[in-house]
Amino acid sequence: KNMITGATQMDGAILVVSAADGPMPQTREHILLAGQVGVPNIVVFMNKQDQVDDEELLELVELEIRELLSSYDFPGDDIPVTAGSALKAVEQLLSDPNTARGSDEWVDKIHALMDDGDKYIPTPSVKVDKPFLMAVEDVFSITGRGTVATGRIERGLVKVGETVQLVGIADTRETTVTGVEMFQKTLDSGMAGDNVGVLLRGVQKEDIERGMVLAKSGSITPHTEFESEVYVLNK
């Protein structure tokens, strides 16, 4: 459930596979689910390279990963694959936080992975010209301030002081945005693609729950009948 929730919001993903063990059953599931929910781009990191002495074994694991990706309609032959060791990189950075690029083999491999992500996963185009919409993922209260709904803004903009509608499950109601926060920073607004907390006026915690949405007033209506496509993972 949690993997699917996160994957539906992704513009790209890093698939981490142990170079020592190769693809595991959950690797196959993650690739399958990534394809089902529409993750557009994947890059691969073969971790624990420090545990593999045989270069041919490393090549075999890479080949297995590429074949697995291709079997689920990802371009396995074209996807960037980087081998390295996250542990070795972390150990080096803990010993010297100022390690420069080019001065340590393991840290450089993480830089190479980030380069792959920058090149292969394009910067998404954000839908700021459409009406505001955010699915509520979690709700909590801040003493003295009110109720905060958190989630990823799917489209549009939301600004402090705007009136929005709370739609779904319960009756549709209007509320005013009194604050927008992202990563513990207070903002004047949030835009499509941002993961934010939206502070709402006059809404109690019990009035809002996961599954509801915040939207620009009058832009959407709830429905009790709809057509859907369901994929059941059975193996």
From Swiss-Prot:
Enzyme Commission number(s): 3.6.5.3
Leading EC class: hydrolase
Q: Where in the cell is it found?
A: Cytoplasm
Q: Which GO terms describe its molecular function?
A: GTP binding; GTPase activity; translation elongation factor activity
| Catalysed conversion reaction | GTP + H2O = GDP + phosphate + H(+)
Report the domain of life of the source organism: Bacteria
Q: Which residues bind GTP?
A: N47, K48, Q49, D50
Q: Where are the transmembrane segments?
A: none
> Where is it predominantly found?
cytoplasm
Residue ranges annotated for the tr-type G domain, each copy included? 1-125
Q: Which Pfam families match?
A: GTP_EFTU (PF00009), GTP_EFTU_D2 (PF03144)
Any one of the GO CC terms: cytosol
Alphabetically ordered keywords of this record: Cytoplasm, Elongation factor, GTP-binding, Hydrolase, Nucleotide-binding, Protein biosynthesis
* Signal peptide positions on this chain: none
Sum up the protein's function in the record's words.
Answer: GTP hydrolase that promotes the GTP-dependent binding of aminoacyl-tRNA to the A-site of ribosomes during protein biosynthesis.
Q: Which family does it belong to?
A: Belongs to the TRAFAC class translation factor GTPase superfamily. Classic translation factor GTPase family. EF-Tu/EF-1A subfamily.
On assembly, the entry states: Monomer.
Query: Which PANTHER family did the record assign?
Result: ELONGATION FACTOR TU, MITOCHONDRIAL, ELONGATION FACTOR TU-RELATED
Q: What is this protein called?
A: Elongation factor Tu
The species this protein was found in:
Leptolyngbya boryana (Plectonema boryanum)
Gene name, per UniProt, is: tufA
